[in-house]
């Protein structure tokens, strides 16, 4: 398939004419030619197979040897309400509104101080907020993906002390050379990339008590739309930090600020240079949020936007989202998991497009198409 073709030339960097030959050569390549043309890394005779594989494995393990003991990763657990509509983790809540096909994920700020050093980070292990909150968030996204395909919209909220979030982010940054801190940062980045590659509409809602700062601010600019309340006292704020400057990259290798402000890089500089909390007018002027309604219009703006979104074809939304989220040059990851998966492997094969009652079949007819609301 096209995913395999992309991996040939973009991942293994096989010469394009050799890849063309390989893809059309019915009998394939023997081992010697496969190695020559870099289709495989090496080839061993059966008599030496076990010995050579052990050597390769040992060499690979030696490259990653840190001399440190890992930390236990207990299962991510949650409590589920009797009706299944609420799933509660330690730092995350997942609420399901089946009637509207809308899921709400709320991430809570930490209530304890951050680890003071590498030893304290190891002592907290998988329970430290910067790791556990993101594991729970990741688990909630996967739960929606595999168990609730009919939910087309995810609204993301946060609650808690913004200063506590920044303190925990700062503690992780201070341990830049520590292997565990590095692995946690990499996991955070992977989780945020899962948001980018989630085939659901994503709205971020910034209102009273929100703590979209530091690493959590990435969820504001990862969303398809963001709504920020313009309150009279200016207490609703967001804050950009060094977390948005490169340590949490997208699949394409650029930051979400770069993807957002591809036309004018000076806006990236302005966002990163913003000092401290930003209220709704300031965030809107910097282009960091989509809409900033006041308290009079807030409820109606959110309601109308949600009702409008869930009424649209889920396949059309998947196509729109996967094209608009990944701005700029493609790479192997974004080709396979972005537009390619959305369009070729999903949209154009679905009854919503080509079925008897699909949108393409009924285009130009007075009859409205009937959609299967399930998402990938």
Language-model segments: which ranges?
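Conserved phosphoryl-transfer motifs of two-component systems
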Residues: 41-42, 290-291
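CoA-thioester-processing core
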Residues: 1-19, 213-270
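C-terminal alpha-helix plus adjacent terminal tail
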Residues: 13-36, 42-219, 226-235, 270-285, ...
């Amino acid at each position: 398939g096209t995913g395999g073709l992309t991996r040939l030339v973009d991942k293994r960097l096989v010469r394009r004419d050799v890849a063309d030959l390989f893809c059309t050569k019915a009998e394939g390549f023997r081992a010697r030619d496969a190695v020559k043309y870099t289709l495989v890394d090496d080839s061993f005779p059966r008599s030496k197979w076990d010995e050579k594989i052990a050597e390769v494995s040992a060499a690979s393990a030696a490259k990653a040897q840190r001399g440190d003991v890992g930390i236990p990763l207990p299962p991510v657990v949650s409590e589920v309400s009797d009706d299944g509509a609420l799933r509660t983790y330690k730092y995350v809540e997942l609420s399901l509104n089946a009637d509207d096909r809308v899921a709400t994920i709320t991430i809570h700020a930490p209530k304890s101080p951050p680890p003071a050093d590498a030893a304290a980070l190891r002592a907290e292990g998988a329970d430290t907020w910067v790791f556990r909150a993101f594991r729970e968030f990741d688990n909630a996204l996967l739960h929606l993906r595999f168990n609730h395909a009919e939910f087309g919209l995810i609204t993301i909220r946060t609650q808690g002390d913004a200063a506590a979030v920044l303190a925990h982010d700062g503690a992780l940054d201070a341990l830049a050379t520590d292997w565990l801190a590095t692995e946690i940062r990499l996991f955070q980045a992977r989780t945020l990339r899962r948001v980018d590659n989630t085939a659901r509409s994503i709205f971020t809602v910034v209102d009273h008590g929100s703590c979209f700062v530091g690493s959590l601010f990435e969820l504001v600019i990862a969303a398809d739309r963001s709504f920020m309340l313009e309150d009279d006292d200016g207490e609703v704020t967001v804050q950009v930090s060094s977390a948005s400057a490169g340590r949490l990259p997208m699949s394409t290798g650029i930051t979400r600020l770069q993807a957002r402000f591809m036309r004018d890089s000076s806006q990236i500089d302005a966002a990163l240079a913003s000092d401290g909390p930003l209220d709704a007018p300031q965030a809107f002027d910097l282009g960091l949020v989509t809409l900033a309604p006041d308290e009079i219009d807030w409820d109606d703006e959110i309601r109308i936007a949600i009702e409008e979104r869930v009424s649209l074809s889920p396949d059309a939304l998947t196509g729109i989202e996967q094209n608009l989220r990944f701005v700029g040059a493609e790479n192997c990851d974004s080709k396979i998991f972005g537009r390619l998966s959305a369009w070729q492997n999903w949209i154009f094969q679905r009854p919503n497009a080509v079925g008897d009652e699909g949108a393409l079949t009924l285009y130009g007819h007075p009859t409205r198409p009937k959609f299967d609301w399930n998402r990938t």
